[in-house]
Amino acid sequence: EIWIGTDGGGINILDPETRRFSLLEHMPGSDNYSLPANSILCLYNDCNNNMWAGSIRNGLISIREVSMKTYTDVPPGNDRGLSNNTVLSLFQESQDQIWVGTDGGGINSFNPLTEKFTHYSSTWEDKVASICQFTPGKLLISLFSQGVFIFNPATGEKQPFTIVDAKTTALLCNRGKAVNLLRNTHHNILFLGEHIYIYDLNTRTF
């Protein structure tokens, strides 16, 4: 199946064999079995084959065969929800850790076993457009209109990452844009913008 998030039309699910679509959408009065909203920004299939959806202003949605559950924003100091209700990006680092990039609330870490969130104040106000694994203990995060950064969850530190050179970095990141990140092999990370750049983790070169 191919899952497609739409802006207002819920989630369309394509069966490639039959070429037919099925639909997940918001149905008033059926909160446990329908989406909380129909505008979906990102989708992520985790290692347990559960689907996660990031919505516009309606939080993080856990989609399972028998039910759905939504996690929304909470006040600072509360670990039972998001730092911002709009979810731009998702990435699973391990079975008990899902990274959530929000639209202005920075990056959140979510443990699906305990259902607890960790917020990182150093990323507050950041719009986290994409997340991927960089090296053990560190992530690459793409911030809207700011660039790509190496993020250390242990310290909360963000270190700017240069894509090829300063000129290329500025063209890709600093004009109302964001780069999408994909670690497509153990050694390579794809930087997806106007062009595709391949970063080799072994040689640390593009």
Residue positions per predicted region:
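Carboxylate-rich, polar loop motifs that coordinate divalent cations or form catalytic acidic clusters
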Residues: 1-206
